């Protein structure tokens, strides 16, 4: 019902707010489908069978995306409204059922519920301006590390994509700025914090496994306690149920069990809180393609009141970033990006500061200028091995490689907190061939935590569960995948493809040690054009060969983890 309402509102806005921009249209953008049959033989269970799949997709454009802005000179008000492309989409998938949705797409965020938004609102006084839209002090959002296989992959989990300044929660206010286009800009922001009360919407009974991470006020022993927030019934405070960790805000559950979790929702919002923060950001472009940005924020907290941890009183956030592109010639270039983040947390109880973040991240790409980036296809490494196995995939919300950048990329993260780099020193190297060699697509990955103490920890006897746990940590990984188009004649093309992914992990304490290795393999060959609109595929997938070994107290244990995988043939008709 809500989507239908937004749909009709958006249609009305086409005629009223955006008279000419963007243009309304009614046309079929995509009408496609496919049907496939696969015969597979599981080499582990020694069983065979058929699998039928059908997919259909209809995309009907109602309106192109666009924007409308006021214009002026000297003293004037700038307002820019942006509308996303509006599209009806209907899908049919035997595995997922049938769906019908009105959707929009903005930037690289995938589906977005915003149809019309204010992009810019500024009062201009020649080169001076006052911005009046909301926003936090998350400086550095436009400094992306140029990783070849996962550029802009996720805007939430930013471990290998970008590193913005800390979120302070002060997002209401204005920005006073001065800008000389293509030279520099400086902005002073004054913002306040709104307070929104929460209330329990419902209570869920959740089954937790042993070792689950628990936070305060997250799970309770009884349903009434979850509603009232009874601290005595909070399992976080029960030493018989949970164990402490290195992080005082997180504990682990000793044994599996079912507990009550309150699901909260926003209640009332108060904007007049007397809580303020200040920020300053500057950006300069001294030469073409070189950009330097520096920003800092300081939290004043509630004026006239005692310092508060909840309000982040006296906290300090700093960001600095540099990115550049240098063209060697028309074929090759380098593209470095370096960022630095610092966050100093003021502890009210001790009246001292504690450094929470002190980290520099750096990315460097050696790019192939004549090859275009690819935002339509995933890398073969992702296609073959999936999100859960790849070093750089760290969140379940990611949906594959967002954009593939032709070239070689190197990434490193350096945590300057005391002793942090002894256990945390991640580096990553990625490669995408682009169109460097005609008909060849190649992808490579190396990732590792090079901290000298990263492998230190308690060693236990090897078992299937221990082996799996070590591999899932992805301590070190190397992967390679490639495909090549072989044109038999004008009609028929054979595309062989192969991928291999090695994952290693280890842990040791004194003479006790354990380690695990896994090599995953996938092969396939597509035959296109033999029959019109049809692709025939022979494949071997989901195969892995692993071994885990441990030596604890002089006793050696080991496990073999071998999955022979599935071989099969597939025929797919598509239009």
Swiss-Prot record:
Keyword Membrane assigned: yes
Record's keyword terms, sorted: Cell outer membrane, Membrane, Signal
Topology in membrane: Peripheral membrane protein
Main subcellular location: membrane
InterPro entries: Autotransporte_beta_dom_sf (IPR036709)
Domain of life: Bacteria
Signal peptide annotation: 1-19
Function noted in UniProt: Major component of the outer membrane sheath.
Protein name: Major outer membrane protein MspA
Species assigned in the record: Treponema maltophilum
